[in-house]
Curated annotation (Swiss-Prot):
Pfam family for this entry, one: MFS_1
Record CDD domains: MFS_MefA_like
Protein name: Multidrug efflux pump Tap
Activation and inhibition: Inhibited by piperine, verapamil and verapamil analogs.
Length: 419
């Protein structure tokens, strides 16, 4: 296979790196701006929740939009709108003064940026099988590379975010995010790939509601996808407040923005190694074992972090969490790609992503006030224990055995025929 055939894969991976790196900067910058002004974990959780509230609906709409308008077009438009939203922070400060960048403004702009992000991510995710075919790669290889790129982005993003906050301030740092989205747009603009353009009218969704319903019906009828979605929903709701509220609160209290970036980098670094090793791991270790081990390890590591050990210990635990969780999203992608028809893929990706975000706002809104009232130690424990229980339950779930079985039916079957 000629190297030129790898061009589409590399363009998609580069665009993913840029967009996700911009998001990584925002993960640090938005909560830091709030904590710097208000000093309250509860206020920071409001902004973090604002980024989550649009995601459930946005991911559902994104999947239908991708299957209707086309993957390439949706990716570029979504990145343009996300970039404009984050650029609004320094623009508001420039036009009305730094005091105008209050909690309400940050919450609105964070929500807008988050609302458009899922469409770009879904569009790029949906192009992976065709890019793999052009490059001569297996699905496991491109899924592992894609997840590794996401983790690499969240190494680069938070690190740049923490360093830029420490040097030029949180408001100016937002220009980094806008620039990253611009580079993502340029990469996808250069992409030429079958299936990336506007779909034929016979295969497009008939409407927004019917398109969402088709995706939901497919996921619900396929037991393995339904089970994976429920596990992801639970774990995300419990873990997300740790990364979005508890870690920023801990490091803000200690005036250590750079260390916050390092902690998030440790998670992403472990995830990078885990994702890169997924193609080899999938041959030797059952996917069901990988899944259960990841959830259990996440819960146990979070329980140790609850005792607020020294920073090097926290870093090691974060790296371990990332390492065991690195293969999880490639497993999700593999199941979707081998069971969903090409014309339905965007909707299925959107539904699976939306399930992960469904309980996010509730977890974030509870974590902030609980942290202010009971402290970081108690809140970490309150979130970690249910994750451990979820991992114990996952060990015995019969549906997860299907992760290691070949698909029983052709992926071009009708939407309602999943079993």
């Amino acid at each position: 296979m000629r190297n030129s055939n790898r061009g589409p894969a590399f363009l998609i991976l580069f665009a993913t790196l840029m967009a996700a790196a911009g998001d990584g900067v925002s993960i640090v910058a938005f909560p830091w701006l709030v904590l710097q002004r208000e000093g309250s974990a509860g206020q920071a959780s409001i902004v973090a929740s604002a980024t989550m509230l649009p995601l459930l609906f946005a991911t559902l709409v994104a999947g239908t939009a991708v299957d209707y308008f086309g993957r390439r077009r949706v990716s570029m438009v979504a990145d343009a709108l996300s970039g404009a939203a984050v650029a609004g922070v320094p623009l508001v400060a420039w036009g009305y003064g730094g005091d105008a960048v209050n909690v309400l403004v940050l919450a609105v702009l964070a929500a807008l940026a988050a609302a458009f992000g899922p469409a770009g991510m879904t569009a790029r995710d949906s192009m992976l099988p065709e890019a793999a075919a052009r490059a001569g790669w297996s699905l496991d290889r491109i899924n592992g590379a894609y997840e590794a790129i996401l983790n690499l982005a969240f190494i680069v993003g938070p690190a740049i975010g923490g360093l830029m906050i420490a040097t030029v301030g949180g408001i100016t740092t937002m220009w980094i995010t806008a620039t990253a989205f611009g580079l993502s747009i340029l990469a996808i603009a250069a992409l030429q790939l079958e299936g990336a353009g506007k779909p034929h009218h016979t295969s497009r969704p008939q409407g927004l509601v019917s398109g969402i319903a088709e995706g939901l019906r497919f996921v619900w009828n396929l037991r393995v996808l339904r089970t994976l979605g429920m596990i992801d929903l639970t774990v995300t709701a419990l873990y997300l407040p740790m990364e979005s509220v508890l870690f920023p609160k801990y490091f803000t209290d200690h005036q250590q923005p750079v260390q916050l970036g390092w902690a998030l980098m440790a998670i992403a670094g472990g995830g990078l190694v885990g994702a890169l090793g997924y193609a080899v791991l999938a041959i030797r270790v059952p996917r069901r074992v990988t899944m259960s081990t990841a959830v259990l390890t996440l819960g146990l590591a979070s329980m140790v972090i609850a005792f607020l050990p020294p920073l090097p210990v926290i870093m090691v635990l974060c790296a371990v969490v990332g390492l065991v969780y690195g293969p999880i999203q490639p497993i999700y992608n593999y199941v979707i790609q081998t069971r969903a028809a090409q014309h339905l893929r965007g909707r299925v990706v959107g539904v699976m992503t939306s399930l992960a975000y469904a309980a996010g706002p509730l977890g974030l809104l509870l974590a902030g006030p609980l942290t202010d009232a009971a402290g970081l130690h108690a809140t970490f424990l309150a979130l970690a224990l249910p994750i451990v229980c979820t991992g114990l339950v996952a060990i015995r779930l019969p549906a997860l055995r299907e992760l290691d079985l070949a698909p029983q039916a052709d992926i071009d079957r009708p939407v309602g025929s999943a079993q």
